[in-house]
């Protein structure tokens, strides 16, 4: 893949719509907290750079990545939000658990996008090593939390 080793967190600031009136929910997994907290920091900083008021960013934590889908659904049901970002990190181990968690979260976020009239943004790192996760949580390949925030803002403004 051509973009596999690029820092995609660099973008044209002016290509992102004003977000000053947006309310954004973020659900972040506590598992691999050293990574997910960096993703959260990146997402919040980027949202604020584009005008989202800190008080309009609702952050909720769930124990692990598999719980992200339920957390996102519950957040969308209980708060008036324009988008929900899910942030997590799953690192491949020696068992098929990685595949089950990644597939479950991917399918769950897809279903939420089809069920609700707001975008649910996939910010789940699915990596083979912890180093790959660190590289994508503020390391040499940027911060995928930043990218999830930009995606959320753009999708709130999406119109067919």
Swiss-Prot record:
It catalyses: (2S)-2-hydroxy-3-oxobutyl phosphate + 5-amino-6-(D-ribitylamino)uracil = 6,7-dimethyl-8-(1-D-ribityl)lumazine + phosphate + 2 H2O + H(+). NCBIfam families: lumazine-synth. Its EC number is 2.5.1.78. It comes from Parabacteroides distasonis (strain ATCC 8503 / DSM 20701 / CIP 104284 / JCM 5825 / NCTC 11152). Pathway: Cofactor biosynthesis; riboflavin biosynthesis; riboflavin from 2-hydroxy-3-oxobutyl phosphate and 5-amino-6-(D-ribitylamino)uracil: step 1/2. Transmembrane segments: none annotated. InterPro entries: LS, LS/RS, LS/RS_sf. GO terms for cellular component: cytosol; riboflavin synthase complex. GO terms for molecular function: 6,7-dimethyl-8-ribityllumazine synthase activity. Belongs to the DMRL synthase family. It comes from the Bacteria. The active site is at 97 (proton donor). 5-amino-6-(D-ribitylamino)uracil binds at residues 31, 65-67, 89-91, 122. Keywords: Riboflavin biosynthesis, Transferase. This is 6,7-dimethyl-8-ribityllumazine synthase.
